[in-house]
UniProtKB/Swiss-Prot annotation:
Keywords from the named record: Transferase, Tricarboxylic acid cycle
Lineage: Bacteria, Pseudomonadati, Pseudomonadota, Alphaproteobacteria, Rickettsiales
Family according to the record: Belongs to the citrate synthase family.
Gene: gltA
Other comment: Citrate synthase is found in nearly all cells capable of oxidative metabolism.
Keyword Transferase among UniProt keywords: yes
Species: Rickettsia felis (strain ATCC VR-1525 / URRWXCal2) (Rickettsia azadi)
Official protein name in the record: Citrate synthase
Active-site annotation: H311, D370
Length: 435
């Protein structure tokens, strides 16, 4: 295989059944290089085995870079902390999709397009009526997003010219559907988007306004939610993003692809972790109980797990968690809860104790992005069943950037993982009366 990133003078040798194969090493612009194993199956009659794809690069990407050992997260080369503190969500969305920060004119045009496409077809309202009142907002959202392909049949056979408009439509409509999912779950009327508001203000308006009551957006709350959206916008080839790419590799329409991402995100090991953190803090109950629960977390025979600590990639403090810790304090101070919020006090003391404990230090278990986000959501008045829905709003930007990049990659093929078969070799069929 030839690749513009390969280095002819550098290769890895793989010996299989006495035969040596030279595998090109593909050079990363930063971070780990990659061994190209694409020829192994055809030339050596072997596949590689990597459960969970922990050591496998499924694609080339220029969008997001993570150094888990150093606690670095960058989008298109920009540090996540700088983006969270200095940018806004739609500017980051533009960056992820187009590769560069926008000019004033580009930014204004982009935000106008997002606002223009925020309405959903009125017939979609009837779909919501088919759900029972106790339906989880993620279940409603999953169905509603998938149904969008029925309203945009032209995208069943999309072209390269459709990529950008498709991304804009998705970014615009997901918050509307998310707010509708919440409103339906609590029995309130849907609130239409307001194009005079910015992206984050508009979402809060659709969530908390009613036909008889206007919602006044608190700027501290707005800024906090803006940061949360930025911090969750993309995170390289995680489970849901990989799911979107795999679905997209078959040529499936973009609404179907995003709905698969939502389904993957709904898993408690992925998008549902911040809700688990809240439940854990409630279970701990008070600071006095922290040592007992630390001991339970260390006991391999105890089912209790310390939620919000550790990450599949980060072996250092998650840079997103550092931003959210300060954001959490800002929000609670604004709401008059900084000194008397029991969950925050437990979280801060739990973090302090864990970071000094050799058990957690040796295992590199540091607070992750989920540790403080749930406390912020709860203080904002957002119920726990909506936590993953908000995650999906933010991650839609990353999904669409990755989906677009995948379709623009000339090397990308339909995804087809292989397996190590360990079942029966061959069995003769017997009729039901002979078994």
């Amino acid at each position: 295989m030839t690749n513009e990133n390969s280095n002819d003078s550098e290769f890895a040798e793989l010996k299989i059944r006495g035969k040596i194969f030279k595998l090109p090493i593909l050079k990363a612009s930063i971070g780990e290089d990659v061994i190209d194993i694409s020829r192994v199956s055809s030339e050596a009659d072997c596949f590689t085995y990597d459960p969970g794809f922990m050591s496998t690069a499924s694609c080339q990407s220029t969008i997001t870079y993570i150094d888990g050992d150093k606690g670095i997260l960058r989008h298109r080369g920009y540090d996540i902390k700088d983006l969270a503190e200095k940018s806004d969500f739609l500017e980051v969305a533009y960056l992820l999709i187009y590769g560069e920060l926008p000019s004033i004119e580009q930014y204004n045009n982009f935000t106008k397009q997002v606002a223009h496409h925020s309405l959903v077809n009125e017939r979609l309202h009837y779909l919501f009526q088919t759900f029972c009142s106790s339906s989880h907002p993620m279940a409603i959202m999953l169905a509603a997003v998938g149904s969008l392909s029925a309203f945009y049949p032209d995208l069943l056979n999309f072209k390269e010219a459709d990529y950008e408009l498709t991304a804009i439509r998705m970014i615009a409509k997901i918050p509307t559907i998310a707010a509708m999912s919440y409103k339906y779950s609590i029995g309130q009327p849907f609130i239409y988007p307001d194009n005079s508001l910015d992206f984050t203000e508009n979402f809060l308006h659709m969530m908390f306004a009613t036909p008889c009551t206007k919602y006044k957006v608190n700027p501290i709350i707005k800024n906090a939610l803006n940061k949360i959206f930025i911090l969750h916008a993309d995170h390289e080839q995680n489970a849901s993003t990989s799911t979107v790419r795999i679905a997209g590799s078959s040529g499936a329409n973009p609404f179907a692809c995003v709905s698969t991402g939502i389904a993957s995100l709904w898993g408690p090991a992925h998008g549902g972790a911040n809700e688990a953190v809240i439940n854990m803090l409630k279970e701990i109950g008070s600071s006095e109980n922290i040592p007992k629960y630390i001991a339970k977390a260390k006991d391999k025979n105890d089912p209790f797990r310390l939620m919000g600590f550790g990450h599949r990639v980060y072996k250092n403090y998650d840079p997103r968690a550092a931003v959210l810790k300060e954001t959490c304090k800002e929000v609670l101070k604004e709401l008059g809860q900084l000194e008397n919020n029991p969950l925050l006090q437990i979280a801060i003391e739990l973090e302090a104790i864990a970071l000094k404990d050799e058990y957690f230090i040796e295992r590199k278990l540091y607070p992750n992005v989920d540790f403080y986000s749930g406390i912020i959501y709860k203080a904002m008045g957002i119920p726990s069943q909506m936590f993953t829905v908000l995650f999906a709003i933010a991650r839609t930007v990353g999904w669409m950037a990755q989906w677009k990049e995948m379709h623009e990659d000339p090397e990308q093929k339909i995804s087809r993982p292989r397996q190590l078969y360990t079942g029966y070799v061959h069995r003769e069929y017997k009729g039901i009366g002979e078994r």
